[in-house]
Amino acid sequence: METRATLRGVRLSVDKGRLVADLIRGKKVDQALNILNFTQKKAAGIIKKVVESAIANAEHNDGADIDELRVKTIYVEQGATLKRFSARAKGRGNSISKPTCHVYVVVGN
């Protein structure tokens, strides 16, 4: 039995998200939440909410036992990039890219 949760379009670099996702892949959910609590990264708080959502989905929709759940799959994909413009001296301009990503979490036995 597998249950999933997704978060799309979050303002986070895909590389920074993957760095945290690699920490909890394959771990039990209580151990994964403990790791995320003590990881001092912006991505840790975002991914923690998605993992908690997947746990709640498994408990409510499938009636799963929380103690047996593991993070089976977690991956972070690149989303759309917000492109902005910053005015510079002498009529020039620089482009600023603000990346987004999508977080997918699958929990199961």
Swiss-Prot record:
Q: Does the record carry rRNA-binding as a key word?
A: yes
Gene3D superfamilies named in the record: Ribosomal protein L22/L17
Query: What are the GO cellular component annotations?
Result: cytosolic large ribosomal subunit
Any coiled-coil regions, as ranges: none
The answer on whether this UniProt entry bears the keyword Ribonucleoprotein reads yes
**Molecular function GO labels:** rRNA binding; structural constituent of ribosome
Keywords, in A-Z order: Ribonucleoprotein, Ribosomal protein, RNA-binding, rRNA-binding
One Gene Ontology term of the biological-process aspect is: translation
* InterPro entries referenced in this protein's UniProt entry, alphabetically: Ribosomal_uL22, Ribosomal_uL22_bac/chlpt-type, Ribosomal_uL22_bac/org-type, Ribosomal_uL22_CS, Ribosomal_uL22_sf
Q: Which HAMAP family match?
A: Ribosomal_uL22_B (MF_01331_B)
- In which family does this protein belong, per the annotation? Belongs to the universal ribosomal protein uL22 family.
The protein's job, in short, is: This protein binds specifically to 23S rRNA; its binding is stimulated by other ribosomal proteins, e.g. L4, L17, and L20. It is important during the early stages of 50S assembly. It makes multiple contacts with different domains of the 23S rRNA in the assembled 50S subunit and ribosome. The globular domain of the protein is located near the polypeptide exit tunnel on the outside of the subunit, while an extended beta-hairpin is found that lines the wall of the exit tunnel in the center of the 70S ribosome.
Q: How does it assemble?
A: Part of the 50S ribosomal subunit.
By what name is this protein known?
A: Large ribosomal subunit protein uL22
